[in-house]
UniProtKB/Swiss-Prot annotation:
This enzyme's EC code(s): 2.1.1.177
HAMAP family membership: 23SrRNA_methyltr_H
Official protein name in the record: Ribosomal RNA large subunit methyltransferase H
Alphabetical list of SUPFAM superfamilies matching this protein: alpha/beta knot (SSF75217)
Family per similarity comment: Belongs to the RNA methyltransferase RlmH family.
Chief subcellular location: cytoplasm
Organism of this sequence: Shewanella piezotolerans (strain WP3 / JCM 13877)
Residues annotated as binding S-adenosyl-L-methionine: 73, 104, 123-128
Length: 156
């Protein structure tokens, strides 16, 4: 199974790149973590945010291979404890499809992305900067993988 992180934003600070890549490299080949970056729309004083969200959403959905299981990362989504995420990852694996996780930009995800998602996951009730979410998701997925594979990374 491949897990795709489809995220808005292309020029992240070095610490984001370093953090994401650290967890990405830990995954085995049979559960690869891939990052697809979508260019953020230009935002300014008079920017049409609804139009920017729509365009970002179109680009995100176009980047997802047909048949992938789509999960949005969004506030109204389901809060998962780490063992629940591990169970969810097992379900994804048994489903036999690759998974695409959608991370929106500063204003979140487009309505079309939310509609296309079969599931919605909420990392926190806190507002998190979208670059940080990449690192948190990568670490959380690695932790879930470690639980499922009896790897000593996760401790109860």
């Amino acid at each position: 199974m491949k897990i795709q992180l489809v995220a808005v934003g292309t020029r992240m600070p070095d610490w984001v790149e370093t953090g994401f890549k650290e967890y990405q490299r830990r995954f085995p080949r049979d559960m690869a973590l891939e990052l697809i970056e979508i260019p953020a729309g230009k935002r300014g004083k008079n920017a049409d945010i609804a139009r920017i969200l729509q365009k970002e959403g179109e680009l995100m959905l176009a980047a997802i291979p047909k048949g992938n299981h789509i999960v949005s990362l969004d506030l109204p989504g389901k809060n998962l404890k780490t063992p629940e995420l591990a169970q969810q990852m097992n379900k994804w694996l048994l489903d036999g499809r690759d998974v695409s996780l959608l991370i929106g930009g500063p204003e979140g995800l487009s309505p079309d992305c939310k509609k296309a998602a079969a599931q919605s996951w909420c990392l926190s009730a806190l507002t998190l900067p979208h670059p940080l979410v990449r690192v948190i998701v990568a670490e959380s997925l690695y932790r879930g993988w470690s639980i499922n594979n009896n790897h000593p990374y996760h401790r109860e």
